[in-house]
Amino acid sequence: MELELLFQNVVNSFAFYNNQVAVAVSGGVDSIVLLHLMTNWAKKNKLSLPTALTVNHGLRPESQKEADFVVSYAKELGAKESFILNWEKQNIKGNIQLQARKARYKLLAEWCKNNNVKYLLVAHHKDDQAETFLLRLERGSGVDGLSSMDYKSFLNGIYIFRPLLNFSRSEIEKYAKLHRLKWIEDRSNYDLKYRRTLYRNLLKASDNQEILTERICLTALHMKRAAKALMHYTRLAFNDCVNVHDLGYIEIKLSEFYQLPEEIALRLLLYSIMAIASKHYKPRYNSLIVIFNKILQKDSNVNCTLSGCKIRKHGENILIIRESSKIQEITLNLPLNEPTQWDNRFSCTILGNQECSVIIAPLKKTQKVPEFLKDYNCCPEVFYSLPVVLKDGKVLAYPDVNYNGKNTNDDKVQCIINSTIKQNLVSLISI
């Protein structure tokens, strides 16, 4: 069948080789077809069979039953293994679908990372692309929001592939019926309280759904090309305007910032905030533009917070600093054999042979900045977002930035930190 041949060409271009691959399977026709195609491709090429992952959001009475179906049917289709990932939701407010989507990707990416799986396949198709475009158009999205999805993207260290992007829902359903596959019909797909359902029905009601969907996807592709051009110039601006400091903050040089076209300057501010907050999702435009406009007023006193970051004017620069109150403490058992990630900004290597439980917390918790840190000529608030090692409320080790001598209260423990913010930036602006 043509769909299968085209799919094989797409997947061959991804160059998985013999790396382990996971497939996100909701139980709907598109993800079942994706798993069927992928297992057949793996068998044909004598490669490792894919693992099926399904997320139980627990939002409907039948959620567990559907997850159990996926596990059972994935085995029948030839998956290597299958797992149910449960969403431990708390106090859901606002847009449930958006929160469920964020949780789903978080659970999938975490499982892949914990199991050394680098590649995750998802079943987005051409109709999803068109519906998403219309949804975002209604919300007033800009170039990025209206851009087409990529065949390949990068999230939290995992490559996400979308091999069905060029196929329509009708082509996928035709394939499923031809191969007598079983799938679940999600009732929420027909619920008119969701805007996506409205746009799905709108496309179906058009005189020629196939042509309209194709043209919407073409417009989204034009937007993607424009977004890539803007990102190219944003990367150049980062080289000229931005300093990423070892102490875990970003400094934007205003003299250079004011010379940039507004769209590039806005993106530079946006991605600086996202890199410090280590968030994949962008802050609300309405909140961001208020801060941006304040920065453009050259005599204004900029002192704002957004996405867990402090945005401060300091001399002739804008500083993006992590809000210490938003940082999660972590508990570890010493000794450690490898570095640990802290706040997604630092890789912490803790040296010492003590066998004990310690907490890595923001320095602000100690209410004391050690003298050696004061030698760094920077805004004092920067220090409060640095990690310290605590035991029973007492400091065992302050952060050693350059690893050039003792800086601890206890000679047996030392905390060497390396900033990972540049890596955060690279993953954000390397489309």
Swiss-Prot record:
Main localization of the protein?
cytoplasm
Q: Which InterPro entries match?
A: Rossmann-like_a/b/a_fold (IPR014729), TilS/TtcA_N (IPR011063), tRNA_Ile_lys_synt (IPR012094), tRNA_Ile_lys_synt_N (IPR012795)
Q: Where in the cell is it found?
A: Cytoplasm
State the Pfam families in the record: ATP_bind_3
Q: So what EC number does this one have?
A: 6.3.4.19
Q: Which GO biological process annotations does it have? A: tRNA modification
Positions with a binding annotation for ATP: S26, G27, G28, V29, D30, S31
Mind listing the UniProt keywords for this protein, alphabetically?
Answer: ATP-binding, Cytoplasm, Ligase, Nucleotide-binding, tRNA processing
What reaction(s) does this enzyme catalyze? cytidine(34) in tRNA(Ile2) + L-lysine + ATP = lysidine(34) in tRNA(Ile2) + AMP + diphosphate + H(+)
A GO term, aspect molecular function: ATP binding
Q: Where, if anywhere, are coiled coils annotated?
A: none
Its Gene Ontology cellular component terms are: cytoplasm
PANTHER family, A to Z = TRNA(ILE)-LYSIDINE SYNTHASE-RELATED
What information about domains appears in the record's comments?
The N-terminal region contains the highly conserved SGGXDS motif, predicted to be a P-loop motif involved in ATP binding.
Q: Which family does it belong to?
A: Belongs to the tRNA(Ile)-lysidine synthase family.
Per the entry, what this protein does is: Ligates lysine onto the cytidine present at position 34 of the AUA codon-specific tRNA(Ile) that contains the anticodon CAU, in an ATP-dependent manner. Cytidine is converted to lysidine, thus changing the amino acid specificity of the tRNA from methionine to isoleucine.
The identity of this protein, by name, is tRNA(Ile)-lysidine synthase
To which species is this protein native? Wolbachia sp. subsp. Drosophila simulans (strain wRi)
Corresponding gene?
tilS
